[in-house]
């Protein structure tokens, strides 16, 4: 707007007719006062418009920065809260992990101790069973050998006279059994 008015004054001054002379050395004080007053008036309006625009821009920038600061502070506060919560959760997980490990260790230890007791009992039972089995086999072998020796000895000593004597004793026992009354 100021530039348009200034161009008009230049055109008028170059027309060589009635107008405003913009050459400072050729003008008189009145013309100079009019030019300076006009420049001051339009310059003041332009400058005040520029200053108002700049003021609005600066205020807007300050408000934006203030908003960003508040937003950043809010984000920082939320981040600190999240960090504290994460630290608490990590501590809780760590303590739960330690507790779980200790419980698991106790459970495994008691399970191993029970397994050891069971194995010892099984070992004792197997040893007893094997001992009884061995004793039975030894007894059976001894009995078999004793019977064979006794039979061999009896067969060696057996003659007709002893044979008759044994038969007679057996017959007496049988007859005594028949004579005994049954109640």
Swiss-Prot record:
GO cellular component: chloroplast thylakoid membrane; proton-transporting ATP synthase complex
Transmembrane segments: 20-42
Molecular functions per Gene Ontology: ATP binding; proton-transporting ATP synthase activity, rotational mechanism
Listed Pfam families: ATP-synt_B
Keyword Glycosyltransferase: no
Subcellular location: Plastid, Chloroplast thylakoid membrane
InterPro entries: ATP_synth_b/b'su_bac/chlpt
Keyword Membrane among UniProt keywords: yes
Annotated keywords: ATP synthesis, ATP-binding, CF(0), Chloroplast, Hydrogen ion transport, Ion transport, Membrane, Nucleotide-binding, Plastid, Thylakoid, Transmembrane, Transmembrane helix, Transport
Membrane topology: Single-pass membrane protein
PANTHER family found in the cross-reference section: ATP SYNTHASE SUBUNIT B, CHLOROPLASTIC
Record note on quaternary structure: F-type ATPases have 2 components, F(1) - the catalytic core - and F(0) - the membrane proton channel. F(1) has five subunits: alpha(3), beta(3), gamma(1), delta(1), epsilon(1). F(0) has four main subunits: a(1), b(1), b'(1) and c(10-14). The alpha and beta chains form an alternating ring which encloses part of the gamma chain. F(1) is attached to F(0) by a central stalk formed by the gamma and epsilon chains, while a peripheral stalk is formed by the delta, b and b' chains.
Other comments on record: In plastids the F-type ATPase is also known as CF(1)CF(0).
Function: F(1)F(0) ATP synthase produces ATP from ADP in the presence of a proton or sodium gradient. F-type ATPases consist of two structural domains, F(1) containing the extramembraneous catalytic core and F(0) containing the membrane proton channel, linked together by a central stalk and a peripheral stalk. During catalysis, ATP synthesis in the catalytic domain of F(1) is coupled via a rotary mechanism of the central stalk subunits to proton translocation. Component of the F(0) channel, it forms part of the peripheral stalk, linking F(1) to F(0).
Stated family: Belongs to the ATPase B chain family.
The protein's name in its UniProt record: ATP synthase subunit b, chloroplastic
Species this chain originates from: Euglena gracilis
Lineage start: Eukaryota, Discoba, Euglenozoa, Euglenida, Spirocuta
């Amino acid at each position: 707007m100021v530039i348009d008015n200034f161009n008009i004054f230049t055109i008028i001054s170059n027309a060589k007719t009635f107008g405003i002379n913009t050459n400072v050395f050729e003008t008189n004080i009145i013309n100079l006062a009019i030019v300076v007053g006009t420049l001051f008036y339009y310059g003041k309006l332009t400058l005040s418009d520029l200053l108002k625009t700049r003021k609005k821009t600066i205020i807007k920038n300050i408000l934006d920065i203030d908003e960003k600061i508040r937003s950043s502070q809010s984000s920082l506060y939320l981040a600190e809260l999240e960090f504290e919560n994460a630290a608490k959760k990590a501590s809780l997980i760590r303590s739960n992990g330690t507790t779980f490990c200790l419980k698991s260790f106790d459970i495994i230890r008691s399970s191993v101790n029970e397994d050891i007791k069971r194995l010892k009992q099984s070992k004792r039972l197997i040893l007893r069973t094997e001992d009884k089995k061995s004793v039975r086999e030894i007894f059976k072998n001894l009995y078999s050998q004793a019977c064979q020796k006794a039979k061999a000895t009896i067969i060696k000593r057996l003659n007709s006279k002893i044979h008759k004597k044994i038969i007679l004793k057996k017959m007496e026992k049988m007859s005594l059994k028949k004579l005994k009354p049954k109640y």
